[in-house]
Amino acid sequence: MTDNGTPEPTAPDTIVLVHGFWVTPLSWEKWVERYEDRGYRVLTPTYPGFEGGVEALREDPSPIEELTFPTIIEHIGGIIEELDKPPIIGHSAGGVLTQILLDHRYGAAGVAIDSVPAEGVRVTPVSQIRSLFPILKNPANRHRAVGFTPEQFHYAFANTISREESDEVYERYHIPASGRLVWVGATANFTPGHQENYVNFSNEDRAPLLLIGGSEDNIMPPAVNQSNVKHYRHAKSPTDHKEFEGRSHYTVIGGEGWEEVADYALEWAVEHAKRPAA
């Protein structure tokens, strides 16, 4: 009971983790184990067509080529609809998907980690341009699944760890990404009308949101994350921001000390997802 005699709010028992581009739900494996050890049910929904996993998508990337933001939202949203409004935690493209899902009234709270920018975020640092250049250098990549080389992955994702360690991460997790969706994100602010990555930043019915970034992230640098946060400045629903020093795009969710980020995200999400007791 609380001090005024009302029942304590109930905390959620299920967490949904949404992966980003260039990886699959396997990228959450450490977080899943940690959260399950704490008694939570953890779901890691994949994108439509990704059911075969890393090796299958490397051999046949056609499901990647066919992706759209709406089909991903419909797929993951359908899974969340069957749950009792869980917290949603997303990384990279999973971060902007989390923002879109909250805007569509899915989830009781959301954490967007190293988020791909939503439509309207116009900051484009040099390191981000360099990271995405392998995809954006050729307009024909809009119709392809495009991967990174190990060298490109090290710069874009894992620049705070050794090349040897980065190559191990690459071998375990890396798959091609949808060139189309990368281009959607890159051109959204120059295309008339709302695009697939649109979020209503002033949505009064949105659940609480935390945006997390890494100070050394090259592909989604701090300036991008900070600009994304500022777009929520007029929102009535809680919107918080946390930046972790010394962390790159990968080492926010993996690498030494990843537990600090995982625990912070979980504690924030669970606290803000609590509902009044029945």
Predicted regions and their residues:
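Active-site glycine-rich loops that stabilize anionic/oxyanionic intermediates
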Residues: 20-23, 92, 215-216
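Conserved alpha/beta-hydrolase
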Residues: 36-59
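Conserved hydrolase catalytic core segment
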Residues: 87-121
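Flexible "cap/lid" loop of the alpha/beta hydrolase fold
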Residues: 107-143, 183-190
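Helix-rich cap/lid subdomain of alpha/beta-hydrolase
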Residues: 128-176, 180-181
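Short beta-strand/loop motif that positions the catalytic acidic residue
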Residues: 205, 211-213, 217
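Conserved alpha/beta-hydrolase "acid-adjacent" motif
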Residues: 218-227
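Catalytic active-site module of serine/aspartate enzymes centered on a nucleophile-bearing elbow/loop
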Residues: 238-278
